[in-house]
Amino acid sequence: SRSGDVIGIKGSEVASFAKSLQRKLLLESTPHYHQERKLWNGLADNKRPAMIAQCIDTDDVIKAVQFATAHDLLIAVRGGGHGISGNAVADGAILIDLSRMSNLSTDLKAMTATAQAGVLLRELDTGAQQHGMVVPAGVVSHTGIAGLTLGGGIGINMRKMGLTSDNLLSVEIVTADG
């Protein structure tokens, strides 16, 4: 739970939630759970979420947030999983995994890019460079754009272009009430 207490959730409720997702819900007993819970930083890679919701769109995220809220579960969110501190995963939490939300599009006329939360910096850089654009962002290619932006987005172009977050035009967020 959010308070750290161990809580029980009926198996039928977990099964119903799993069926509602377009991708998978992983539990510790599920194949690939241990592979999917891992983070980039091995020093912070000892946390065990209660479940991993592999989301592919906003509707999946809404379902995961609503399930977590209904069951008083702590929520951890992972985009690229690059964060050094390991905060993208928490013991006993529902891990909302955004890594499969990786759609990216560019608007050459507006000179903008639209990226889902699971897009990695290497993908954004490649997409921008194909159109003669540059993204004011960091230099570590496996950093997720969502986490980079949430942290401000320090990068090599910031003196000329500002932080990544300075160039953010809009976001779609899911609040605690779904």
Predicted regions and their residues:
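N-terminal accessory segments
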Residues: 1-154, 159-160, 167
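Active-site and channel-lining beta-strand-loop segments
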Residues: 104, 163-178
